[in-house]
């Protein structure tokens, strides 16, 4: 992407436009700005309290029978084949998330959702039930799974029969930015310290639930902005 001088004054770190840059880039983003509802046997659960919707979940509306997956099927070699056999086409499959993490995270950095959920074309919905509720994230919103995926804690019943789901999502092209700023060193301008941060766990999940990323990496961004403010007032020896 082309890097162009930024006109955002609060990012300014020097006296000339060449010292501050903004890089625009486009990327797909699964926007979940509409309905997010999960009703279990007539009881409406509370989004972000009783469950969280995974950020890659597509639009879905309907009622499904609930089934509970036996832990013996949480095998990386057979999981996808069994789940996609057709027997779960109109089912909401509840799986043991804690056991899933133990058996399916086969190597560091594995993208488990892409590896095990994206290939499934014959599953109505997936509910990952664990002891603790996984916080809402937005970092994996550049793709869709074929079905909605929910995270729930131990309060999710072990004997549910029906779930009603209403999720509104839209894959859009989003304008993102990389901000690049430069402060020259007072004694050794040819030598550099490079400080970087990323801020991707923010977003909207439903009409009234806004996440500012404070549960994850917005703290790193805040730290970097404070460092920039400090070094703007106190020029460092190194760039």
Model-derived segments and spans:
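Noncatalytic luminal/extracellular "stalk/propeptide" segments of secretory-pathway proteins
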Residues: 1-92, 96-104
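Structured segments of extracytoplasmic/periplasmic soluble domains
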Residues: 2, 11, 226-234
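Extracytoplasmic/secreted cell-surface and envelope-processing proteins
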Residues: 13-15, 31-32, 101-110, 134-139, ...
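Soluble metallo-hydrolase cores and metallopeptidase-like ectodomains found primarily
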Residues: 58-80, 129-213, 229-238
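Mature extracellular/periplasmic domains of secretome proteins
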Residues: 80-88, 113-123
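Loop/turn elements at helix/coil->beta-strand transitions in domains of secreted/extracellular proteins
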Residues: 88-92, 122-125, 189-193, 238-239
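A generic structural motif
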Residues: 96, 117-131, 150-154
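Active-site alpha-helical elements of protease catalytic centers
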Residues: 214-227
